UniProtKB/Swiss-Prot annotation:
This is Small ribosomal subunit protein bS16. InterPro entries: Ribosomal_bS16, Ribosomal_bS16_CS, Ribosomal_bS16_dom_sf. Keywords: Ribonucleoprotein, Ribosomal protein. Belongs to the bacterial ribosomal protein bS16 family. It comes from Shewanella denitrificans (strain OS217 / ATCC BAA-1090 / DSM 15013). GO terms for biological process: translation. HAMAP family: Ribosomal_bS16. Pfam families: Ribosomal_S16 (PF00886). The keyword Methyltransferase does not apply. The gene is rpsP. It comes from the Bacteria. One of its GO terms (molecular function) is structural constituent of ribosome. The keyword Ribonucleoprotein applies. GO terms for cellular component: cytoplasm; small ribosomal subunit.
Length: 83
């Protein structure tokens, strides 16, 4: 099953997450199909916290991809920010 989920990056104690489309059988930080955005929970000042390609997210959801709980919340926030 294809899922849209967070893949952790960054340094120790400084998380940075890529929002990726991946097969659910692959490891969290392993192989993915497509990177559709990023989430930086520790962004300061003018740094960007969230960037999502909503067109590609819509494409994958229409194709049948499931979203993790956290990614669903981030998508909702991104839609609210663009509206």
């Amino acid at each position: 099953m294809v899922t849209i989920r967070l893949a952790r990056g960054g340094a120790k104690k400084r998380p940075f997450y890529n929002i990726v489309v991946a097969d659910s059988r692959n490891a969290r930080d392993g192989r993915f199909i497509e990177r559709v955005g990023f989430f930086n929970p520790l962004a300061r000042g003018q740094e960007e916290t969230l960037r999502l390609d909503l067109d590609r997210v819509e494409h994958w959801v229409a194709t049948g991809a499931a979203t993790s709980d956290r990614v669903a919340k981030l998508i909702k926030d991104a839609r609210k920010a663009t509206a």
